[in-house]
Amino acid sequence: MAVSNMFVLGAAGINGGDILFQLVMFLILLALLQKFAFGPVMGIMKKREEHIAGEIDEAEKQNEEAKKLVEEQREILKQSRQEVQVMMENARKSAEDKKEEIVAAAREESERLKAAAKQEIEQQKDQAVAALREQVASLSVLIASKVIEKELSEQDQEKLIHEYIQEVGDVR
């Protein structure tokens, strides 16, 4: 059968030696391509694959770092909000304390002024009473001297008392 195939191939105008030569040349070409073309191309592809894998790893690493930074920023923001809340609470408490201090100082000043006013009123009252006593004493002396100057009847005594009351009323 192999011989009949050769005749069929020969009748068709195909030469078996040419096919064998082309097959050997193709294998040599394939070996040369493997050594000089496919090897370097595969090396370049391998390097490219490693480079891309490295880039992916680097991107994932940077993504993780970015997530960490975002989380850190959130934590810092949370702490800042807490600090602001504490500061606001302290400021409110400080303002409340200051208000109470000012109110207490105002009350003390009011009490002091009230006490000073009472003391001044008391002094003026004492001075008025003392002045009135002096006037009463001098009027008493005056009346006594008038009584001594003349002896009075009951009518004269009543008249003298009414005059004295009028003088005391006028002095006031």
Curated annotation (Swiss-Prot):
Pfam families: ATP-synt_B
Membrane-protein topology: Single-pass membrane protein
Transmembrane region(s): 13-33
Keywords: ATP synthesis, Cell membrane, CF(0), Hydrogen ion transport, Ion transport, Membrane, Transmembrane, Transmembrane helix, Transport
Chief place of localization: membrane
SUPFAM superfamilies, per database record: F1F0 ATP synthase subunit B, membrane domain
Stored CDD domains: ATP-synt_Fo_b (cd06503)
Subcellular location: Cell membrane
Molecular function per GO: proton-transporting ATP synthase activity, rotational mechanism; proton-transporting ATPase activity, rotational mechanism
Keyword Nucleus carried by entry: no
GO CC annotation terms, alphabetical: plasma membrane; proton-transporting ATP synthase complex
InterPro entries given in the database record: ATP_synth_B-like_membr_sf, ATP_synth_b/b'su_bac/chlpt, ATP_synth_F0_bsu_bac, ATP_synthase_B_chain
Function: F(1)F(0) ATP synthase produces ATP from ADP in the presence of a proton or sodium gradient. F-type ATPases consist of two structural domains, F(1) containing the extramembraneous catalytic core and F(0) containing the membrane proton channel, linked together by a central stalk and a peripheral stalk. During catalysis, ATP synthesis in the catalytic domain of F(1) is coupled via a rotary mechanism of the central stalk subunits to proton translocation.
Similarity section: Belongs to the ATPase B chain family.
Subunit structure: F-type ATPases have 2 components, F(1) - the catalytic core - and F(0) - the membrane proton channel. F(1) has five subunits: alpha(3), beta(3), gamma(1), delta(1), epsilon(1). F(0) has three main subunits: a(1), b(2) and c(10-14). The alpha and beta chains form an alternating ring which encloses part of the gamma chain. F(1) is attached to F(0) by a central stalk formed by the gamma and epsilon chains, while a peripheral stalk is formed by the delta and b chains.
Protein name per its UniProtKB record: ATP synthase subunit b
